[in-house]
Amino acid sequence: MNDVKYDVNDMPKPGLLVGLSFQHLFAMFGATVLVPILVGIDPAIALFSSGLGTLAHLTVTKYKIPAYMGSSFAYIAAMQTLMKTDGIAAVAQGAMAGGLVYLLVALIVKYAGKDWIDKVLPPIVVGPIIMVIGLNLAANAVNDATTLNKSYSIYALLISMVTLFAVILFNMYGKKIVGVVPILLGLIVGYTFSAVLGLLTGHSFINFSEVAAAHWIQVPNFDIPFVDYSFKLYPSAILTMAPIAFVTMTEHFGHVMVLNSLTERDYFKDPGLDHTLTG
Protein backbone atom coordinates (compact mmCIF):
# COMPACT_ATOMS: atom_id res chain seq x y z
CA MET A 1 0.00 0.00 0.00
CA ASN A 2 1.16 3.55 -0.69
CA ASP A 3 1.99 5.84 2.21
CA VAL A 4 0.55 8.91 0.49
CA LYS A 5 -3.24 9.04 0.33
CA TYR A 6 -5.64 11.88 -0.33
CA ASP A 7 -9.34 12.09 0.26
CA VAL A 8 -11.74 13.40 -2.39
CA ASN A 9 -11.59 17.03 -1.27
CA ASP A 10 -7.95 17.09 -0.13
CA MET A 11 -5.50 19.29 -2.01
CA PRO A 12 -2.06 17.74 -2.72
CA LYS A 13 1.08 19.85 -2.58
CA PRO A 14 1.73 21.86 -5.79
CA GLY A 15 4.45 19.53 -7.12
CA LEU A 16 2.40 16.38 -6.58
CA LEU A 17 -0.71 18.12 -7.88
CA VAL A 18 1.03 18.85 -11.19
CA GLY A 19 2.28 15.27 -11.42
CA LEU A 20 -1.15 13.82 -10.71
CA SER A 21 -2.74 16.19 -13.23
CA PHE A 22 -0.35 15.10 -15.98
CA GLN A 23 -0.86 11.45 -15.07
CA HIS A 24 -4.63 11.85 -15.27
CA LEU A 25 -4.26 13.68 -18.59
CA PHE A 26 -2.17 10.91 -20.14
CA ALA A 27 -4.33 8.16 -18.63
CA MET A 28 -7.52 9.55 -20.14
CA PHE A 29 -5.95 10.83 -23.35
CA GLY A 30 -5.53 7.50 -25.12
CA ALA A 31 -9.12 6.31 -24.71
CA THR A 32 -10.69 9.72 -25.28
CA VAL A 33 -8.75 10.27 -28.50
CA LEU A 34 -8.92 6.66 -29.74
CA VAL A 35 -12.72 6.64 -30.07
CA PRO A 36 -13.00 9.66 -32.42
CA ILE A 37 -10.04 8.37 -34.46
CA LEU A 38 -11.76 5.00 -34.94
CA VAL A 39 -15.06 6.70 -35.78
CA GLY A 40 -13.59 9.40 -38.02
CA ILE A 41 -14.27 12.50 -35.93
CA ASP A 42 -11.82 15.29 -35.08
CA PRO A 43 -10.18 14.24 -31.75
CA ALA A 44 -10.06 17.90 -30.70
CA ILE A 45 -13.86 17.95 -30.62
CA ALA A 46 -13.88 14.90 -28.34
CA LEU A 47 -11.37 16.51 -25.96
CA PHE A 48 -13.31 19.80 -25.91
CA SER A 49 -16.62 18.02 -25.31
CA SER A 50 -15.01 15.81 -22.69
CA GLY A 51 -13.81 18.86 -20.77
CA LEU A 52 -17.22 20.52 -20.88
CA GLY A 53 -18.91 17.25 -19.94
CA THR A 54 -16.63 16.77 -16.94
CA LEU A 55 -17.27 20.30 -15.69
CA ALA A 56 -21.02 19.80 -16.14
CA HIS A 57 -20.90 16.48 -14.27
CA LEU A 58 -18.93 18.00 -11.40
CA THR A 59 -21.40 20.88 -11.17
CA VAL A 60 -24.50 18.67 -11.18
CA THR A 61 -23.01 16.27 -8.61
CA LYS A 62 -21.98 19.21 -6.40
CA TYR A 63 -18.25 18.43 -6.78
CA LYS A 64 -18.65 15.31 -4.66
CA ILE A 65 -17.71 12.63 -7.20
CA PRO A 66 -14.12 12.42 -8.53
CA ALA A 67 -15.07 11.32 -12.04
CA TYR A 68 -14.02 12.21 -15.57
CA MET A 69 -16.36 12.12 -18.57
CA GLY A 70 -14.58 10.60 -21.56
CA SER A 71 -15.43 8.86 -24.83
CA SER A 72 -17.50 5.69 -24.65
CA PHE A 73 -16.33 2.55 -26.44
CA ALA A 74 -19.84 1.08 -26.45
CA TYR A 75 -20.96 3.45 -29.21
CA ILE A 76 -18.05 2.84 -31.60
CA ALA A 77 -19.71 0.29 -33.92
CA ALA A 78 -22.95 2.28 -34.17
CA MET A 79 -21.13 5.55 -34.77
CA GLN A 80 -18.90 4.03 -37.45
CA THR A 81 -21.97 2.75 -39.31
CA LEU A 82 -23.79 6.08 -39.04
CA MET A 83 -20.72 8.01 -40.19
CA LYS A 84 -20.57 5.88 -43.35
CA THR A 85 -24.28 6.15 -44.14
CA ASP A 86 -25.48 9.55 -42.87
CA GLY A 87 -22.45 11.45 -41.56
CA ILE A 88 -21.67 13.48 -38.46
CA ALA A 89 -25.18 14.96 -38.23
CA ALA A 90 -26.68 11.53 -37.60
CA VAL A 91 -23.98 10.67 -35.04
CA ALA A 92 -24.65 13.91 -33.14
CA GLN A 93 -28.39 13.29 -33.18
CA GLY A 94 -27.92 9.75 -31.92
CA ALA A 95 -25.65 10.96 -29.12
CA MET A 96 -28.28 13.50 -28.07
CA ALA A 97 -30.90 10.74 -28.01
CA GLY A 98 -28.65 8.74 -25.69
CA GLY A 99 -28.32 11.76 -23.42
CA LEU A 100 -32.11 12.14 -23.28
CA VAL A 101 -32.39 8.49 -22.20
CA TYR A 102 -30.04 9.28 -19.31
CA LEU A 103 -32.19 12.27 -18.30
CA LEU A 104 -35.37 10.18 -18.49
CA VAL A 105 -33.95 7.45 -16.25
CA ALA A 106 -32.61 10.12 -13.87
CA LEU A 107 -36.14 11.54 -13.51
CA ILE A 108 -37.55 8.07 -12.84
CA VAL A 109 -34.89 7.46 -10.18
CA LYS A 110 -35.58 10.84 -8.60
CA TYR A 111 -39.28 10.15 -8.10
CA ALA A 112 -39.42 6.34 -7.90
CA GLY A 113 -36.13 5.59 -6.16
CA LYS A 114 -33.32 3.28 -7.25
CA ASP A 115 -34.35 -0.01 -5.64
CA TRP A 116 -35.71 -1.28 -8.96
CA ILE A 117 -32.28 -0.74 -10.53
CA ASP A 118 -30.63 -2.84 -7.81
CA LYS A 119 -32.99 -5.69 -8.70
CA VAL A 120 -32.63 -5.40 -12.47
CA LEU A 121 -28.88 -4.70 -12.48
CA PRO A 122 -27.15 -6.26 -9.43
CA PRO A 123 -23.34 -6.11 -9.21
CA ILE A 124 -23.06 -9.65 -10.59
CA VAL A 125 -24.66 -8.39 -13.82
CA VAL A 126 -22.90 -5.02 -13.97
CA GLY A 127 -19.41 -6.52 -13.58
CA PRO A 128 -19.47 -8.82 -16.64
CA ILE A 129 -20.94 -6.07 -18.84
CA ILE A 130 -18.02 -3.78 -17.99
CA MET A 131 -15.60 -6.65 -18.64
CA VAL A 132 -17.12 -7.31 -22.07
CA ILE A 133 -16.86 -3.64 -23.09
CA GLY A 134 -13.18 -3.58 -22.10
CA LEU A 135 -12.25 -6.96 -23.56
CA ASN A 136 -13.99 -6.08 -26.82
CA LEU A 137 -11.24 -3.51 -27.42
CA ALA A 138 -8.37 -5.79 -26.45
CA ALA A 139 -7.57 -6.30 -30.13
CA ASN A 140 -7.03 -2.55 -30.57
CA ALA A 141 -4.68 -2.47 -27.59
CA VAL A 142 -2.67 -5.44 -28.88
CA ASN A 143 -2.52 -3.92 -32.35
CA ASP A 144 -1.25 -0.57 -31.04
CA ALA A 145 1.32 -2.31 -28.84
CA THR A 146 2.78 -4.46 -31.61
CA THR A 147 2.73 -2.31 -34.76
CA LEU A 148 4.90 0.49 -36.07
CA ASN A 149 3.92 2.36 -39.25
CA LYS A 150 0.99 -0.06 -39.68
CA SER A 151 3.17 -3.19 -39.72
CA TYR A 152 4.27 -5.64 -37.03
CA SER A 153 7.42 -4.61 -35.20
CA ILE A 154 9.36 -6.48 -32.53
CA TYR A 155 10.68 -3.11 -31.39
CA ALA A 156 7.14 -1.83 -30.80
CA LEU A 157 6.37 -4.92 -28.73
CA LEU A 158 9.58 -4.49 -26.73
CA ILE A 159 8.84 -0.83 -25.99
CA SER A 160 5.27 -1.69 -24.99
CA MET A 161 6.40 -4.42 -22.60
CA VAL A 162 9.03 -2.20 -20.97
CA THR A 163 6.44 0.55 -20.47
CA LEU A 164 3.85 -1.89 -19.12
CA PHE A 165 6.19 -3.53 -16.62
CA ALA A 166 7.50 -0.12 -15.52
CA VAL A 167 3.95 0.97 -14.66
CA ILE A 168 3.28 -2.31 -12.82
CA LEU A 169 6.52 -2.10 -10.81
CA PHE A 170 6.00 1.56 -9.87
CA ASN A 171 2.44 0.78 -8.82
CA MET A 172 3.31 -2.29 -6.75
CA TYR A 173 6.61 -1.27 -5.15
CA GLY A 174 6.77 2.52 -5.43
CA LYS A 175 6.93 4.42 -2.16
CA LYS A 176 5.19 7.71 -1.45
CA ILE A 177 5.01 9.93 -4.54
CA VAL A 178 6.49 7.21 -6.80
CA GLY A 179 3.59 4.90 -6.03
CA VAL A 180 1.05 7.65 -6.63
CA VAL A 181 2.07 8.48 -10.21
CA PRO A 182 2.98 5.07 -11.75
CA ILE A 183 1.41 5.81 -15.15
CA LEU A 184 3.29 9.09 -15.55
CA LEU A 185 6.59 7.47 -14.54
CA GLY A 186 5.89 4.52 -16.83
CA LEU A 187 5.42 6.90 -19.76
CA ILE A 188 8.72 8.60 -18.96
CA VAL A 189 10.48 5.22 -18.83
CA GLY A 190 8.85 4.19 -22.11
CA TYR A 191 9.88 7.38 -23.90
CA THR A 192 13.41 7.18 -22.53
CA PHE A 193 13.73 3.55 -23.58
CA SER A 194 12.39 4.43 -27.05
CA ALA A 195 15.01 7.15 -27.46
CA VAL A 196 17.86 4.88 -26.33
CA LEU A 197 16.64 1.99 -28.49
CA GLY A 198 16.45 4.35 -31.45
CA LEU A 199 20.06 5.40 -30.98
CA LEU A 200 21.22 1.79 -30.66
CA THR A 201 19.29 0.44 -33.66
CA GLY A 202 19.28 3.46 -35.95
CA HIS A 203 15.48 3.48 -36.10
CA SER A 204 13.37 6.53 -35.27
CA PHE A 205 10.71 5.63 -32.71
CA ILE A 206 9.99 9.19 -31.58
CA ASN A 207 8.83 11.79 -34.08
CA PHE A 208 7.79 15.28 -32.99
CA SER A 209 7.63 16.76 -36.50
CA GLU A 210 3.83 16.91 -36.51
CA VAL A 211 3.85 18.47 -33.05
CA ALA A 212 6.35 21.10 -34.20
CA ALA A 213 4.25 21.86 -37.28
CA ALA A 214 0.97 22.11 -35.37
CA HIS A 215 -0.53 25.40 -34.20
CA TRP A 216 -0.17 26.23 -30.50
CA ILE A 217 -3.80 27.38 -30.37
CA GLN A 218 -6.42 26.15 -32.81
CA VAL A 219 -10.22 25.96 -32.70
CA PRO A 220 -11.56 22.40 -33.23
CA ASN A 221 -13.33 21.71 -36.52
CA PHE A 222 -16.86 21.94 -35.16
CA ASP A 223 -19.80 20.87 -37.36
CA ILE A 224 -22.61 23.29 -36.50
CA PRO A 225 -26.26 22.58 -37.44
CA PHE A 226 -27.80 25.04 -39.93
CA VAL A 227 -24.28 26.35 -40.65
CA ASP A 228 -22.27 23.35 -41.82
CA TYR A 229 -25.25 21.14 -42.64
CA SER A 230 -29.04 21.35 -42.89
CA PHE A 231 -31.09 19.93 -40.04
CA LYS A 232 -32.70 16.59 -40.75
CA LEU A 233 -34.27 14.00 -38.51
CA TYR A 234 -32.44 10.64 -38.50
CA PRO A 235 -34.75 8.01 -36.97
CA SER A 236 -32.18 5.28 -37.67
CA ALA A 237 -29.58 7.14 -35.58
CA ILE A 238 -32.01 7.60 -32.70
CA LEU A 239 -33.17 3.97 -32.77
CA THR A 240 -29.58 2.74 -33.02
CA MET A 241 -27.87 4.79 -30.33
CA ALA A 242 -30.62 5.42 -27.77
CA PRO A 243 -30.76 1.75 -26.63
CA ILE A 244 -26.97 1.69 -26.23
CA ALA A 245 -27.43 4.28 -23.49
CA PHE A 246 -28.70 1.47 -21.25
CA VAL A 247 -25.40 -0.38 -21.81
CA THR A 248 -23.28 2.65 -20.89
CA MET A 249 -25.66 3.32 -18.00
CA THR A 250 -24.79 -0.10 -16.64
CA GLU A 251 -21.14 0.79 -17.04
CA HIS A 252 -21.84 4.02 -15.16
CA PHE A 253 -23.35 2.09 -12.24
CA GLY A 254 -20.20 -0.02 -12.12
CA HIS A 255 -17.98 3.06 -12.08
CA VAL A 256 -19.95 4.53 -9.18
CA MET A 257 -19.71 1.22 -7.30
CA VAL A 258 -15.93 1.25 -7.70
CA LEU A 259 -15.75 4.87 -6.53
CA ASN A 260 -17.90 3.96 -3.53
CA SER A 261 -15.39 1.26 -2.63
CA LEU A 262 -12.29 3.42 -3.20
CA THR A 263 -13.55 6.48 -1.32
CA GLU A 264 -15.61 4.62 1.31
CA ARG A 265 -18.68 6.67 0.44
CA ASP A 266 -22.12 5.94 -0.98
CA TYR A 267 -22.57 8.18 -3.99
CA PHE A 268 -25.86 6.46 -4.78
CA LYS A 269 -27.24 8.32 -1.76
CA ASP A 270 -25.17 11.50 -1.78
CA PRO A 271 -25.40 13.27 -4.20
CA GLY A 272 -27.73 10.54 -5.45
CA LEU A 273 -27.99 8.35 -8.54
CA ASP A 274 -30.34 10.84 -10.20
CA HIS A 275 -27.59 13.49 -10.01
CA THR A 276 -24.86 11.18 -11.34
CA LEU A 277 -27.05 10.16 -14.29
CA THR A 278 -28.03 13.75 -15.05
CA GLY A 279 -24.37 14.82 -14.94
Predicted ranges, named:
Residues M1-M69, F73-G87:
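N-terminal signal-anchor module of multipass membrane proteins
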